[in-house]
């Protein structure tokens, strides 16, 4: 078990090919760019609340962000074992007129899209239905990737996971431990190596410790 502080794309260069059993991560959503009702080319404005990070302003141009995330996912596939899985969490950005969807993810071999129902209390807004869901893109490297569903737990019978966000956490957008544990129980064994390139508040590491997995 080890933690690194640095640019994940730089740190991952030192991780050997085909060495990671599972990758679970949620990147910054580039809300720094889309926040403050930024005007779009069609004259409409985005509706997005900025997330504040300690050492990253989360403010790339859409093209820069797309290139960054594609490079990240390419690196994830490089370090992932043929039997491994990636769980990549992302969201839609809303505007007054259209939804900005992370289409770049579809360049990769998605096995399934899991819907994370955060169960937030809806806020009133006159222009759209308040979003309470996020996407978890389950990406598998090959057809030989491991999958082991625990049929005793109803959560694994559906691609909609009803999990409330973590609350006792100072980080702006923390994973709930249950979400990470669902991914681990479905695709890993004890002592497997799990990578979270962004790490955030360290929830992936905590879940790995709870289930006797090794983490980076």
Task: Label the predicted regions.
Residues 1-216:
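Core catalytic lobe of class I
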């Amino acid at each position: 078990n080890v933690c690194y502080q640095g640019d994940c794309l730089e740190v991952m260069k030192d991780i050997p090919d085909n060495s990671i059993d599972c990758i679970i991560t949620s990147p910054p959503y580039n809300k720094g760019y889309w926040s403050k009702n930024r005007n779009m080319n069609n004259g409409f404005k985005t509706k997005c609340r900025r997330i504040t990070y300690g050492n990253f302003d989360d403010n790339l141009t859409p093209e820069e962000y797309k290139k960054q995330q594609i490079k990240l996912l390419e690196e994830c596939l490089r370090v992932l074992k043929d039997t491994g899985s990636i769980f990549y969490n992302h969201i839609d950005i809303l505007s007054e007129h259209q939804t900005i969807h992370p289409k770049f993810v579809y360049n990769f071999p998605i096995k399934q899209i899991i819907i994370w129902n955060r169960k937030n209390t809806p806020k009133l807004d006159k222009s759209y239905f308040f979003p309470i869901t996020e996407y978890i893109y389950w990406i598998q490297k090959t057809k030989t990737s491991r999958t082991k569903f625990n049929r005793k737990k109803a959560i694994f019978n559906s691609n909609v996971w009803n999990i409330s966000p973590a609350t006792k956490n100072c980080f702006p957008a923390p994973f709930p431990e249950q979400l990470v544990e669902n991914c681990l129980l479905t695709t890993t064994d004890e002592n497997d190596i799990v990578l979270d390139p962004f790490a955030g508040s360290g929830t992936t590491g905590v879940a790995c410790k709870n289930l006797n997995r090794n983490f980076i």
